[in-house]
Each structure stands twice: as structure tokens, then as C-alpha cells.
């Protein structure tokens, strides 16, 4: 019995040595476990169990290694099959994005004021001024007051700058191809040709001659005389002989419809001439814009006077233009404003009179050099005539005589054809013209 008691006490001691039972911790979340998606779960390797070293763990690790090798091979093949992206294609993609941001069509406006790097005040032709944003891809070094900018059609944000913009009318005035006329095509006018060379051609080709002698070359010349005496022809010959840029404009083109467009066109004309220096600006029929000033209530007359004032400013402004020469031509120099043709602006006035006997003979020889003339043609009869014939009249007589020969199916021009042509030209000039046209 005692043994039983001692055995019972030993069992109680063993129970005291065992740890007490602890319940498991409560779950942190209730319900079904949510599946995680994203880059972490796709790149995370699976957990290998059991953790002890055994054959099963080795097989699982080898299987994971095979999957990783397959993934590596797939990525290598994918990179090889992808087209190579060079810098040009990247730039093209960026330009495409910029074009999408700009939108289409674009509105043209003027930059009135720059507030900061990202904002400006612009004005457009379709409305008032606007406070707009400047997009980040715009080259801000090209922005200046008065610049022509491109605006988004909806938000009117500045999305571009038109650099080096030139008035389309000024581009039309620029003579791209040199005229074919030369000094050999001018009959007579030796004194006029010499004066033109000294005033226009030599300062552009040999400016050092004027520096050595210590004088400033003339800024411009004016050619005046009756119609058809060779003023425009001499200007074309100068353009042919020099390699300078030749800008030709008629005086009536400087008269514009809207207020301020005429002076703006004059500024654009001389700005392009300055950029393309050495250059020659030929203004034909200058009397259309350079007439004498007088008090007038007409808005059109005041606009013409403003255009002439801008022309005066460009001729003798503060900016000295040594490589820009001005040639003017007119039939009525007495109607021009004295301020326009004073020395300092127009230093030489070259008169073109009606041709004398010697000049007439040269002009007839030039225009009949390539004509098939009959043996009975006597040009001295027309040269010695007392009729006031200009160079243009002589050219018209030669052309008309050839047309009369073609009318009769002849390939040679006779003396009779010249007589009929002369009578026809003189009739058109005097009796056939309105009274007072050539006064």
C-alpha cells in the first residue's frame, strides 16, 4: 500500500515538470486569405519545404533552377527579337508627342509681353490680348517682343516660334535669278553707265578704293527721265554685273490697305536687304509713294506720307548700311518730296534724256543684230529722222516690222515693213493715246 502511495506521488511530480498548455494565437484576419497580385508575387520565389537537407528539397531546388534557366533564355530571345531603338527613332517619337500637344490647326499671334519663363501676353488677329502659358518644349531663346508665335487653337498656349519670318511680299520682291541684260545691251548712255558704276557697282566690289581716298560711297541714286529711255534696263544690267542680292519693288506695292502695313513692309524690305548684304534695292516708280507732302484730311494720303517717312528713316537712319545700295527710278522727279532726294539720302541724280543720233544708231544695231533684214533696208533714214524716238520706241518699231513680215509669210524684213511699223508706233504714241498722257 505504501508502494502505491509512493508511486502516486511520483506521477504528480512528473505532471508538475510538464509545461502548461497554451492556446494558439488568434488569427490576424478573418475570412479567406486574399491573393496578392503584382510584381512582388510574380518575382518572389516559392518557399521550399522541408527546410532540412534531404532528397525532396534537392529535387524542388533543381526544379526551380530549371524554371529560372527557362525564364533567362526567354528574356534573352525576347531582347534579340525586339527591333533596335536608335536615337533618331526616339527623337521622332518625341516630335510626334510634341505635335500631338500642339494640336492642329495652329493660330498665329504676336508676343506682346513676357511675364516670366512660363507665361506671356499674346495677341492674335481674331481677338483681344490673352494671358497664356508657354509650353516647356518651346525654345525660349527665340522669344522676343513682337515675335510671331504659334498658338494652340483651343487653349491659345504658346507652342512654337516662327523664326526668321519674312513678309511673303518681300520674298516675291527678291530676284532669285539674275537678269540676262548686260551693259552691252544698252545703246549709248556711256555717261550714265559710268556714273552708275561709280555709285553702285564699285562700292560693292571694291570698297577699299573709297577707304583709301577717304570718302564715303553714295548710299543711292535716282534715275529720272522720260518713259522708255532705259532706266529700268540699266538697273537690270547692274544686277547682272554684281553678285549682290537684287530686290525689286514698285512704288505702288508699298501702299497697303490697312493702317501701318506700308511702313512695316518698308522695314521688312530693308531688313531682308541687310540680312542678304551685299544687296541692291531697286524701287521703280518711286513717285507713287514719294510725292510732296501737304495737309490732307484723307486717311489714304496720310498713310502714304507715313510710308514715305519710314522710307526716309531707312535711308539715313542711325544704322549705317554700307553694303545696301538703293536705286530709284521715276518719270516725274519734279513731283518728289525734296527731303527724299536730298544729298545724304540720294547722292546722285542721273538724267536719262531722249537718244541722240549716235545713240539711236547703236540702239537700232542692237535690236536688228539677230533679224533677217532685206538688202533694201536703210536704217539711216530712221536714225536721221526728226521724230522724238526713245529706246523703247525703237525696240517697238523693230518688233512691229518683224510681225508685219510674218503676217505676209515672209522670213525677211523689208524697208517698207520698217516704215509701216514706225507710222504705227508714232500713231499709238500721239494720236492714238488719250490727250495729256505724255505731258
UniProtKB/Swiss-Prot annotation:
Disulfide bonds: none annotated. InterPro entries: 26S_Proteasome_ATPase, AAA+_ATPase, AAA_lid_3, ATPase_AAA_core, ATPase_AAA_CS, NA-bd_OB-fold, P-loop_NTPase, Prot_ATP_ID_OB_2nd. One of its GO terms (molecular function) is ATP hydrolysis activity. Pfam families: AAA, AAA_lid_3, Prot_ATP_ID_OB_C. ATP binds at residues 225-232. It is found in: Cytoplasm; Nucleus. Belongs to the AAA ATPase family. This is 26S proteasome regulatory subunit 4 homolog. It comes from Dictyostelium discoideum.
